[in-house]
């Protein structure tokens, strides 16, 4: 379907099907449409309401252009949509490190800061991790440690083609929804933090359509009503659980998992240096209780979707032990050292 027909359908207030959205995104990513047409297509898609079919179709188009990497089906991603303006430290990144120490295979897809002061790439880099390993080095790192960090610009170079247009539009489009679904390893297990409660069902259905095996879509809230794109240590967490094609909903509080509740200000983050120091202290076992328990809660969910814990409560115990026994600290050091070694070796081999 030519883009004019797609535009006509959207202008009539209709939504695009999976195939139509894929063709639309194929044309956008290949540079076949004018800037004016792309802006119109993206804006109308948003105005008409994004569907799970559209998200799945757009994802397929972008994933076909991704730099390939081969991990395995055990890999878990912990990520959020961003956009909650809560200013917390890098909880999902800390959770990935701790869950990995507990025995979860991690494929953390991330980037530098966009809506926050410090993104997952920023804090990992500050901790000493080499964030731009070539795919073959990342595969080796994963094979040795069960941990991989997949830097979005490295694996999705085609996204550069639309960066300027997205900035020009200046409002949210389907691209803002796609981020957590674009892990280049094609993970089947995820914790997806969603800041907008209205998007939870959309993510659950999109993940189902794209073959996810076990995912928890989480939306946290503080008791003051602040939305969070992560499990909340400051109030309730709404969960949609997708497991083998079936969905269930839950509303939980930290106390159900033997965790305390803490005000949002107690888990505030800051610069990359400050957030890295927070994570170091969590791993060292010297962090304030609020920081430690926020990371443990998210780690527990990763343990659950990763299949090593039978429930979140069991995952909490595993995450606690990884910290208290020193496993998390030693594991983080081993991952960082291995990434540096591989980066140096592959750099020598490419010279």
From Swiss-Prot:
Keyword Metal-binding in record? yes
Positions binding Mg(2+) 2 in this chain are 229-230
Could you say which EC number(s) this protein's record lists? 2.4.2.18
InterPro entries named in the record:
Anthranilate_Pribosyl_Tfrase (IPR005940), Glycosyl_Trfase_fam3 (IPR000312), Glycosyl_Trfase_fam3_N_dom (IPR017459), Glycosyl_Trfase_fam3_N_dom_sf (IPR036320), Nuc_phospho_transferase (IPR035902)
Q: What is this protein called?
A: Anthranilate phosphoribosyltransferase
Q: Which GO terms describe its cellular component?
A: cytosol
What does the record give as its pathway? Amino-acid biosynthesis; L-tryptophan biosynthesis; L-tryptophan from chorismate: step 2/5
Q: Which UniProt keywords apply?
A: Amino-acid biosynthesis, Aromatic amino acid biosynthesis, Glycosyltransferase, Magnesium, Metal-binding, Transferase, Tryptophan biosynthesis
Where do the annotations place anthranilate 2 binding?
A: 166
Superkingdom, according to UniProt? Answer: Bacteria
Which spans of this chain does the record mark as coiled coil?
A: none
Q: Which cofactors are named for this entry? A: Mg(2+)
Question: What does the similarity note say?
Answer: Belongs to the anthranilate phosphoribosyltransferase family.
What binding partners and quaternary form does the record give? Homodimer.
What's the record's note on cofactor binding?
Binds 2 magnesium ions per monomer.
Biological process according to GO: L-tryptophan biosynthetic process
